[in-house]
From Swiss-Prot:
Pathway info: Pyrimidine metabolism; UMP biosynthesis via de novo pathway; UMP from orotate: step 2/2
Lineage: superkingdom: Archaea
Protein name: Orotidine 5'-phosphate decarboxylase
GO molecular function: orotidine-5'-phosphate decarboxylase activity
Lineage, broadest ranks: Archaea, Methanobacteriati, Methanobacteriota, Stenosarchaea group, Methanomicrobia
C-alpha cells in the first residue's frame, strides 16, 4: 500500500450508493478505504471490488478464529478484491500464520490489531499489545493497528517494531484522536471515519485532515 496522503477512510455506512459517492468524492485525499461488517453485511462482498476503483480496500473483519476458519475467511476477502485484511492477534501465532499464508498467496497484506481505540480497548488488549506486536513482526505481517486515541501507545508500539512494520491508527476525529498527534507518535496512516462521511462536505473534511497531516510531516 503506497503512502501518499497518510490517511485511510473508514467507510462505515450501510448504503451502496452512499458508499460509492463518498469514496469517489474523497479519493484524492486517501491512500485506502477501510470497510467493515456494517457495509459488507448490508451490500455484500461485491462492494469491495466496486470501491477498489477509487482506492485500495482494507477489509476490517478483525478475523479471530482457529487457523482453518481464518484461512477460509481470508480466501473470500482476497478473492473479493481486498488489498489487505485486519486480523486479531490474541488468537495466537498459528491463527495469524494462517492469515499471512493466504495473503502471501494473493500478494496481499495483513494488519494485526495490537490495541483498539475505544476506552474498553485498554481493559484487556493493552496488557497483551506488546507481545502481539512482537509476534506480528516475527510472523511477517505488513502492519499493526494501534489507537490514535492514545498516541503514547502508538509511540510504545513503534519502539518495539522499529521500521519493520507499518502502523495504521484508528480513532481520529469522532473518537477524540488528533491526526497530527498520532503521526508525530509514529503512525504511518491515520484512519478517519465519521468526521469525513458524516460531514456536510466529506471532500472538504478529508482535505482539511489531509492538510493537517502534511503540515505535521513537513514539520518533522
Amino acid at each position: 500500500m503506497e503512502r501518499n496522503t497518510c490517511m485511510i477512510l473508514a467507510l462505515d455506512v450501510t448504503e451502496r450508493e452512499e458508499a460509492l459517492k463518498i469514496a469517489e468524492n474523497v479519493r484524492e485525499f486517501v491512500d485506502a478505504i477501510k470497510v467493515g461488517y456494517p457495509l459488507i453485511l448490508a451490500t455484500g462482498l461485491d462492494i469491495i471490488r466496486e470501491l477498489a476503483r477509487f482506492a485500495p480496500v482494507i477489509a476490517d473483519f478483525k478475523v479471530a478464529d482457529i487457523p482453518n476458519t481464518n484461512r477460509l475467511i481470508c480466501e473470500q476477502v482476497f478473492k473479493a478484491g481486498a488489498d489487505a485484511v485486519i486480523v486479531q492477534g490474541f488468537t495466537g501465532r498459528d491463527s495469524l500464520d494462517a492469515c499471512i499464508e493466504v495473503a502471501s498467496k494473493y500478494g496481499k497484506d495483513v494488519f494485526v490489531v495490537s490495541e483498539m481505540s475505544h476506552p474498553g480497548g485498554a481493559e484487556f488488549l493493552q496488557s497483551a499489545a506488546e507481545a502481539i506486536a512482537k509476534m506480528a513482526v516475527e510472523a511477517g505481517a505488513f502492519g499493526l493497528v494501534a489507537p490514535a486515541t492514545r498516541p503514547e501507545r502508538v509511540k510504545e508500539i513503534r519502539k518495539i517494531i522499529g521500521d519493520r512494520l507499518t502502523i495504521i491508527s484508528p480513532g481520529v476525529g469522532a473518537q477524540g484522536g488528533k491526526a497530527s498527534d498520532v503521526i508525530s507518535a509514529g503512525a504511518d496512516w491515520v484512519i478517519v471515519g465519521r468526521s469525513i462521511y458524516k460531514a456536510e462536505s466529506p471532500k472538504e473534511a478529508a482535505c482539511e485532515i489531509a492538510e493537517e497531516i502534511q503540515a505535521e510531516l513537513r514539520g518533522k
